[in-house]
Amino acid sequence: MSSVPLSVYLVLALILFCIGLYGALTKRNTVIVLICIELMLNAVNINLVAFAKYGAHPGIAGQIFALFTITVAAAEAAVGLAILMALYRNRKTVHIDEIDSMKH
């Protein structure tokens, strides 16, 4: 059975992170920005699992930390979507340019 080299995982994670970063910085829809942030977190999880597999001391610590970050990302997504729903109810929009001020 052939093993995939570490560099493949790192390049994949880099591509996913760059796509997420580009979307988070350029898009004006807050839902899309939230999805891009989640994509960046998934790229970090790929790195965690890859380094856990190919590191000097392979073990389960990388997978456990990846599961922890997935849990945190799920909570972040739930809170983010709840905030977006409240903003949409008040402002009738989800575009960043129109909801950037805190006053009502």
Swiss-Prot record:
Enzyme Commission numbers on file: 7.1.1.-
Keyword Membrane: yes
Function text: NDH-1 shuttles electrons from NADH, via FMN and iron-sulfur (Fe-S) centers, to quinones in the respiratory chain. The immediate electron acceptor for the enzyme in this species is believed to be a menaquinone. Couples the redox reaction to proton translocation (for every two electrons transferred, four hydrogen ions are translocated across the cytoplasmic membrane), and thus conserves the redox energy in a proton gradient.
Subunit comment: NDH-1 is composed of 14 different subunits. Subunits NuoA, H, J, K, L, M, N constitute the membrane sector of the complex.
NCBIfam families xrefs: PRK05715.1-2, PRK05715.1-3, PRK05715.1-4, PRK05715.1-5
Gene Ontology CC, one term: NADH dehydrogenase complex
Localization annotation: Cell membrane
Membrane-protein topology: Multi-pass membrane protein
Chain segments annotated as transmembrane: 4-24, 31-51, 64-84
Protein name as annotated: NADH-quinone oxidoreductase subunit K
GO biological process, one term: ATP synthesis coupled electron transport
UniProt keywords, alphabetically: Cell membrane, Membrane, NAD, Quinone, Translocase, Transmembrane, Transmembrane helix, Transport
InterPro entries listed in its UniProt record: NADH_UbQ_OxRdtase_chain4L/K, NUOK/Mnh_C1-like
Record-linked Pfam families: Oxidored_q2
GO molecular function terms noted in the UniProt entry: NADH:ubiquinone reductase (non-electrogenic) activity; quinone binding
Catalytic activity field: a quinone + NADH + 5 H(+)(in) = a quinol + NAD(+) + 4 H(+)(out)
Similarity-based family: Belongs to the complex I subunit 4L family.
Keyword Translocase assigned: yes
